[in-house]
């Protein structure tokens, strides 16, 4: 079930470093180089597969930008918060 904007903003404190923009949770992770950026994405893959919930992402030389939303619900759901928490534990 899609969470309303007030609920999302209230819960942002649960997921350090994430923001709420354009109906998505968003975070930029910074790294030393491209290799570290790609390794980070590789660590996300099994978590996303296990949850059957995959982030939108952009990989740059020394950073990865992640956006989370549940397309079938048209916005942010509990599943997005759960995935954000798991991703935060990687780094």
Curated annotation (Swiss-Prot):
Q: Which InterPro entries has this protein been placed in?
A: PCD_sf (IPR036428), Pterin_deHydtase (IPR001533)
Which Enzyme Commission numbers does its entry carry? 4.2.1.96
- GO molecular-function annotation terms? 4-alpha-hydroxytetrahydrobiopterin dehydratase activity
What Gene3D superfamilies does its record include? Transcriptional coactivator/pterin dehydratase (3.30.1360.20)
Q: Kindly provide the name given to this protein in its UniProt entry.
A: Putative pterin-4-alpha-carbinolamine dehydratase
Catalytic activity from the UniProt record: (4aS,6R)-4a-hydroxy-L-erythro-5,6,7,8-tetrahydrobiopterin = (6R)-L-erythro-6,7-dihydrobiopterin + H2O
Per UniProt, the keywords (alphabetical) are:
Lyase
Against CDD domains, the record matches this protein to: PCD_DCoH
Family per record: Belongs to the pterin-4-alpha-carbinolamine dehydratase family.
Chain coiled-coil ranges: none
Root EC class: lyase
- Biological process annotations from GO: tetrahydrobiopterin biosynthetic process
Highest taxon, organism lineage: Archaea
Which organism is this entry from? Answer: Sulfolobus acidocaldarius (strain ATCC 33909 / DSM 639 / JCM 8929 / NBRC 15157 / NCIMB 11770)
Per the UniProt record, which residue ranges are transmembrane? none
């Amino acid at each position: 079930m899609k969470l309303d904007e007030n609920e999302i903003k209230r819960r942002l404190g649960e997921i350090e470093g994430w923001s709420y923009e354009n109906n998505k949770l968003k975070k930029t992770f910074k790294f030393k180089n491209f290799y570290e950026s790609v390794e980070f994405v590789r660590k996300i893959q099994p978590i996303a597969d296990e949850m059957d919930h995959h982030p939108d992402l952009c990989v740059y030389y020394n950073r990865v930008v992640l956006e989370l939303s549940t397309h079938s619900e048209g916005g942010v759901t509990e599943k997005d918060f759960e995935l954000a928490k798991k991703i935060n534990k990687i780094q």
